[in-house]
Amino acid sequence: MVVIAVSGQPGSGKTTIAREIARVLGLPLVSSGLLFREMAARMGMDFIEFHKYAETNPDIDKKVDSLAIERAKAGDVVLEGHLTAWIVRPYADVCIYLKASLETRARRVALRDGKSLQDALREVAEREELNRRRYLSIYGIDINDLSIFDLVLDTSHLSVNDAVRISLDYTCTSLSFKYSRKIC
C-alpha cells in the first residue's frame, strides 16, 4: 500500500512530477491543487480570489485535506498539493518537496496559464503569502519548515526529465528498501 506525497511551492513542478511518478508506478494521482481550482471555477472565482476567500473560510481547506487523508489511508496513491505532505505524513511512505526560485516559478506559471511574466510574478508571490498565512492560522503549520520531507529538490535549473528522474530514483530506492523488494 504505497503512498507518495508531493508538495512544494507554486510553480515548482509539483503536478508534473507527481503525475509522472503516478504513471510510472501505475498509481492514481489525487491533486489538491486541481480540486481547489475546480472549486474556484464552480464558485465563479479566479484562483487568487478563491485563495483569499479560503483564508476566511477554513472549511474549504479542510474539505480538500480530508479527501487527501481518506485517499492516503486507503493506500496505493500519489497525492499532490502545497500542504499535502504535512497533512498525510503519518500515512506516507515518501514525502517530496519541490522548490524553485521565484523567477523560475513565475516563468513557468506565465507559460502554463498564458499570463505576462509580471502578472505571474505578482500572482505567485501573493499565492505563496496567502498559503503561508492560511496554513499557519488553520493548522499551525509553518510551510517553511521542511523537516518532514524525505527529499527536498530545487527544480530551478533542472529540466522536467531530470527532476522526474531524480524524484523517481529516490522514490524507487526508498520504497524498495522499505518493502524489501523492487517496487519500480
Curated annotation (Swiss-Prot):
Binding annotation for ATP: G8, Q9, P10, G11, S12, G13, K14, T15, T16
Gene3D superfamilies (alphabetical): P-loop containing nucleotide triphosphate hydrolases
GO molecular function annotations of the record: ATP binding; CMP kinase activity; dCMP kinase activity
Top-level division of the source organism's lineage: Archaea
Keywords associated with the record: ATP-binding, Cytoplasm, Kinase, Nucleotide-binding, Transferase
Entries under InterPro entries matching the protein: Cyt_kin_arch, Cytidylate_kinase_dom, P-loop_NTPase
Biological process (GO), any one: pyrimidine nucleotide metabolic process
EC number: 2.7.4.25
CDD domains for the chain: CMPK
Similarity comment: family membership: Belongs to the cytidylate kinase family. Type 2 subfamily.
Protein name: Cytidylate kinase
Source species: Pyrobaculum aerophilum (strain ATCC 51768 / DSM 7523 / JCM 9630 / CIP 104966 / NBRC 100827 / IM2)
